């Protein structure tokens, strides 16, 4: 049946009527509003290293140069202590701890681990700091992934041996066997994890029932992308395949929940280009993630608009299908306020200004932790990313300390549901272990 797509943009006052196959879409563009936000901690140790010593210090009463130096020294001490532990425990498990390896093996391994430990902070700062050197990033990210997996399995091996010892079983396996087992398991997981990170994400399909959704919107198909993180590894071909997969899903709405890329817009323009080929019947919407605020947040908002996406920069659209309407709202990431960019902060009140309170609302907010505000504002469904599902097990347990949910559909309060994507790409270490990437197809159902 032929219909009329109608788009109204309050910002420019333009009205365009186009004969097309589909339903009516009404887009209401609101100017960014000011609001409140809370700072989020650095995603990983790598982020902390890239930022430590370079973050501005707010001058308040009683804060002088000596106190600022003490704070900076304290941060460095914590970061360096964590680094030493991350590198030292795997070396001790693999090459010391009574393994009785020949002395040359012990010495060479110590030199290799020490060199990696000393080089890692330099590479991180060169790669993820202001210089943004891709080669340094690739090396540092790979080192971080390898060391994290070795560290995790070294801890597990020590805990298992301790449990056996305390239970009176003794040590059924010699230290050398344990070290070989840790190395083999880690190598296997890293090989598999690299494949998981680089492959085309699988499509995860899920029905979500929204009691306030009109029957005309029943069956609305919402494709969710998040955390593509185009970065120092050129994934232009992967990006094109993701776009093809999205187009095959015949979506009504496509959402990108932030963290498009790491690096400058000029560095990642080619990898992001396939985003412009994605199709939807009603809308393609995007919000900023925390990584946009490590670089060019406003630049990415403008570029996504050039690629045909609606940037929900504390604003909303209203889409109509089958005579029923749905509000698509979005807010900046919660770290936006600390970026000092004018008009950038998470502001749900501004995003919903002028929206009919009787209509159901789908909110896109990068971090799951924003669901507290969403539930308080009566949001029906929040879509988020950020967590990567932990990306490399067992990092998911650390993520859970900062976020209410790591992955999946959850309920918060009487009305609000939250869907948290594990992400479409990966950040930093090119590995995904027990946290597969996804392209999500949410089918909205009326009660």
Report the location of each language-model feature.
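Non-catalytic terminal accessory segments
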Residues: 1-199
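Hydrophobic alpha-helical transmembrane segments in integral membrane proteins
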Residues: 176-180, 187-212, 232-237, 295
């Amino acid at each position: 049946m032929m219909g009329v797509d109608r788009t109204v943009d309050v910002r420019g006052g333009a009205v365009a009527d186009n004969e097309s196959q589909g339903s009516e879409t009404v887009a209401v563009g609101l100017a960014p509003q000011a609001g409140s936000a809370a700072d989020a901690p650095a995603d990983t140790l790598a982020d902390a290293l890239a930022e430590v010593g370079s973050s501005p210090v707010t001058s308040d009463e009683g804060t002088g140069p000596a106190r600022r130096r003490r704070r900076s020294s304290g941060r460095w001490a914590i970061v360096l202590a964590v680094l030493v532990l991350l590198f030292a425990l795997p070396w001790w498990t693999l090459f010391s701890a009574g393994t009785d390896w020949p002395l040359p093996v012990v010495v060479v391994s110590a030199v290799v681990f020490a060199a990696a430990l000393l080089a890692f902070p330099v590479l991180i700062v060169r790669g993820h700091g202001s210089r943004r050197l891709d080669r340094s990033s690739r090396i540092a990210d790979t080192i971080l992934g390898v060391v994290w997996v070795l560290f995790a399995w070294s801890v597990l091996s020590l805990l298992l041996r301790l449990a056996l010892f305390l239970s009176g079983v003794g040590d059924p396996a010699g230290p050398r066997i344990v070290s070989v087992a840790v190395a083999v398991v880690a190598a296997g997981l890293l090989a598999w994890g690299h494949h998981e990170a680089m492959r085309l994400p699988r499509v995860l399909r899920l029905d979500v029932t929204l009691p306030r959704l009109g029957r005309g919107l029943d069956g609305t198909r919402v494709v969710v992308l998040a955390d593509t993180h185009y970065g120092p590894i050129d994934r232009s071909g992967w990006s094109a395949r993701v776009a093809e997969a999205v187009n095959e899903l015949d979506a009504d709405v496509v959402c990108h929940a932030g963290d498009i890329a790491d690096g400058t817009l000029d560095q990642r323009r080619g990898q992001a280009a396939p985003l412009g080929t994605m199709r939807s019947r009603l809308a393609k919407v995007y919000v900023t993630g925390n990584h946009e605020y490590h670089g060019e947040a406003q630049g990415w908002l403008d570029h996504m608009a050039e690629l045909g996406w609606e940037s929900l920069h504390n604003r909303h659209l209203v889409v109509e299908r089958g005579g029923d309407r749905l509000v698509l709202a979005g807010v900046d990431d919660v770290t936006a306020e600390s970026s000092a960019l004018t008009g950038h902060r998470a502001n749900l009140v501004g995003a919903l200004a002028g929206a009919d309170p009787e209509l159901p609302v789908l909110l896109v907010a990068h971090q799951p932790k924003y669901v507290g505000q969403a539930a308080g504002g009566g949001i029906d469904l929040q879509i988020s990313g950020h967590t990567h599902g932990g990306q490399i097990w067992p990092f998911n347990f650390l993520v859970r300390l900062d976020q209410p949910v790591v992955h999946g559909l959850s309920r918060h309060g009487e009305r609000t549901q939250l869907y948290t994507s594990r992400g479409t790409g990966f950040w930093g270490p090119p590995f995904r272990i027990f946290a597969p990437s996804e392209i999500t197809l949410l089918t909205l159902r009326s009660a």
